[in-house]
């Protein structure tokens, strides 16, 4: 099965998405948490063998520098550190304004296209909605946090032998069988039983496919929070 994940328009688009989840002013977000979310996302893409563009990696190195300085004991005020953070937040704010204008122009484009018979050029800004307000990217960002924790656990297990022959179809059947018995399960609980990262990835992709097909239903009560699967819609 090919993995096709809607990407962001660039590193600032990803950062804006993460910042917007906190529902506060850009300058009031917990910057270290945002940086950790970004780094988890990039690491998960790498584990899943998805291509990561160079500008994402460059931003990751800059964010790691900000994070490391944030976590150092503050014996002396680091003016350079504050400048790095301020510069980053200003770039996110500027990108937010740019994206708002771009979306407004896209809407106007859609309206004008109704008056012409030729097909309009499609403009895409967001990834597909799976169920209600949950998108593929919402679930993937939550999944990237789980993957970060699972990687840490598996690093201490030197007896695990990786295998790459997990079939998405088999995982889908396994999830459906489990829901027949339990009605409600969390992905975290399933992942705890996994022995390899390949198994974790296969289960996540199987879950996405089941959600897309409306075979199972998904709940997430907080941003980046636990992913709950249900047999029936509430």
UniProtKB/Swiss-Prot annotation:
- Report the principal subcellular site: cytoplasm
> What InterPro entries does this protein's entry cite?
ScpA
GO BP annotation list: cell division; chromosome segregation; DNA replication
Q: Where in the cell is it found?
A: Cytoplasm
Q: Which domain of life is it from?
A: Bacteria
Q: Which UniProt keywords apply?
A: Cell cycle, Cell division, Chromosome partition, Cytoplasm
Q: What's in the GO CC field?
A: cytoplasm
Entry function: Participates in chromosomal partition during cell division. May act via the formation of a condensin-like complex containing Smc and ScpB that pull DNA away from mid-cell into both cell halves.
Subunit structure, per the record? Component of a cohesin-like complex composed of ScpA, ScpB and the Smc homodimer, in which ScpA and ScpB bind to the head domain of Smc. The presence of the three proteins is required for the association of the complex with DNA.
Which family does the similarity line name? Belongs to the ScpA family.
- The name under which this protein is listed is Segregation and condensation protein A
Native organism: Streptococcus pyogenes serotype M18 (strain MGAS8232)
